[in-house]
């Protein structure tokens, strides 16, 4: 027979206490360590939000286009700072088509018998692909096409703050150093036990890799035929040198 207090607890509608999970927010989402990088942690301002810090450092915290507008900050002289539009943001098809649509005249070629439209004749700079009006220079409607054109025209020479430029350059140098370290990583050498195991396999089966893969005694871990080929090729290269 259970205790009366325990029965009351079971019938109570009060939420039961759950053990606190480390690295998890109250909303249940995983807590992200934004200060994992030493350069970002050194230049992080705890008085600002994550978005404000990323904008100040010259980084982007979200690749999607903003859905609710952008924050307008007041400068020292009292004017409102205008945030430039990011050319890498991919806009929705409805918004893009509404902005690109313009009033104009076109010529239509019809079938003399049925009266159906055969061909729509536009200006030289525009064509119709799949019922959509596209530029000849960008028939796939690639949003990065305009960016490449702007870069060739000198968009890379836009002025940026020295602190932002320095931080981004430090991060790029760090990423380049880590990439070089991965490339220059020393290859794994086979141990003596592995070389002895490969020698026994070759002595018994020769070049028959399928028989090696099926051998339960010499190949208890059931290494695949392709894996055995790579190991034996590496063993031969080390012994031929």
Swiss-Prot record:
Biased composition annotated in UniProt, kind: Low complexity: 137-146
Which terms in the GO cellular component ontology are assigned? nucleolus; preribosome, large subunit precursor
UniProt name for this protein: Nucleolar protein 16
Assembly description: Component of the pre-66S ribosomal particle.
What are the subcellular locations of this protein?
Nucleus, Nucleolus
Q: Where is this region: Disordered?
A: 1-29, 92-111, 132-196, 208-241
Q: Which InterPro entries match?
A: Ribosome_biogenesis_Nop16
Q: What's a single GO BP term from this record?
A: rRNA processing
In the UniProt record, does the keyword Nucleus occur?
yes
- Give the compositionally biased regions (Polar residues): 154-172
Q: Which gene encodes it?
A: nop16
């Amino acid at each position: 027979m259970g205790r009366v207090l325990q029965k009351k607890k079971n019938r109570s509608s009060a939420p039961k206490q759950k053990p606190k999970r480390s690295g998890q927010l109250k909303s249940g989402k995983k807590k992200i360590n934004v200060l994992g990088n030493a350069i970002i942690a050194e230049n992080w301002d705890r008085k600002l939000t994550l978005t404000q810090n990323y904008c100040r450092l010259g980084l982007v915290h979200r690749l999607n286009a903003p859905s609710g507008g952008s924050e307008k900050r007041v400068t020292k002289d009292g004017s409102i700072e205008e945030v430039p539009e990011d050319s890498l943001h991919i806009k929705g098809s409805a918004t893009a088509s509404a902005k690109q649509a313009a009033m104009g005249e076109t010529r239509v070629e019809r079938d003399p018998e049925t009266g159906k439209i055969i061909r729509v004749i536009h200006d030289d700079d525009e064509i119709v692909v799949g019922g959509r009006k596209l530029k000849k220079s960008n028939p796939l409607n690639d949003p990065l096409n305009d960016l490449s054109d702007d870069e060739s025209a000198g968009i890379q020479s836009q002025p940026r703050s020295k602190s932002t430029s320095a931080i981004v350059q430090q991060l790029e140098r760090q990423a380049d150093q880590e990439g070089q370290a991965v490339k220059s990583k020393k290859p794994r050498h086979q141990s003596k036990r592995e070389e002895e195991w490969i020698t026994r396999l070759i002595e018994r089966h020769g070049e028959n890799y399928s028989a090696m893969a099926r051998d339960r005694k010499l190949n208890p871990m059931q290494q695949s035929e392709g894996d055995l080929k790579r190991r034996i090729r590496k063993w031969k290269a080390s012994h031929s040198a």
